[in-house]
Amino acid sequence: FLPLLAGLAANFFPKIFCKITRKC
């Protein structure tokens, strides 16, 4: 469960960060 959550976060957070800061 934990590795899956870490993998999901690794995909999710960069996209959110990209939208907020507009630095991709």
Swiss-Prot record:
Q: Which domain of life is it from?
A: Eukaryota
Task: Give the record's GO CC terms.
Answer: extracellular region
The Gene Ontology biological process terms listed for this entry are: defense response to bacterium; killing of cells of another organism
* Keyword Secreted found: yes
Question: Which residues lie in coiled coils?
Answer: none
Q: Does the keyword Repeat apply?
A: no
InterPro entries attached to this UniProt entry: Antimicrobial_frog_1
Keywords (A to Z) from UniProt: Amphibian defense peptide, Antibiotic, Antimicrobial, Cytolysis, Disulfide bond, Hemolysis, Secreted
Q: Where in the cell is it found?
A: Secreted
State the disulfide connectivity: 18-24
Tissue specificity note: Expressed by the skin glands.
Where is it chiefly localized?
secreted
What does it do? Shows antibacterial activity against representative Gram-negative and Gram-positive bacterial species, and hemolytic activity.
Protein family per UniProt: Belongs to the frog skin active peptide (FSAP) family. Brevinin subfamily.
**Name of the protein this chain belongs to:** Brevinin-1Ecb
